[in-house]
Amino acid sequence: MIRINQIKKSYGTHENRALILKGISTEIEDGDFVVILGASGSGKSTLLNVISGLEQPDSGSVTYDGTDITAFNDRELTAFRRENVGFIFQQYYLLPNLTVEKNVRMGADLAGNSDYRSVLKAVGLENKLKKYPGELSGGEQQRVAVARALAKRPRVLFLDEPTGALDEATGRQVLDYISRLQEEYRFTVVMVTHNLNIAEMANTVI
């Protein structure tokens, strides 16, 4: 279980500091599909970054089964993210000089997992292994990003507007892949979106 307790986060200089997260508390059960819903600038991505360990809060705690990651130093946070979480963002961040297979294998290698081909097959890319990112459509590139994140078998998958750069039909297809893979691999999903239709996929909305 992930417990978020009285998280506060602010940005800016001392004179012009803006409080973005104002004492947020919630719990996320293992295997939950959680959506952080809100308008642009409401602090959705900031909350995701704090929960995932990409940013530290000003105060409060984030615990994974009782372990408070806000007490970790940078080295410990890096190790925690490598071992426990996967990330998918609106931008794909694929390495253009590597094939689909090698991009995905990078995620598997981080976790010492050799079974990355099953994830490639699950997202319908088994026939694109030798293609390069520049040869793929936007939807296919995002599926590569999904496969790379899941190849390491993360405990929690964090997604920040993962379909924002895709048309509605392609975005829905990518989300369907994620939903099916979650059922198969039983990981927790925490996704940021402003889209009410996407939020309907979740069993918990923050």
PLM features per residue range, with description:
Residues 2-205:
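ABC family nucleotide-binding domain
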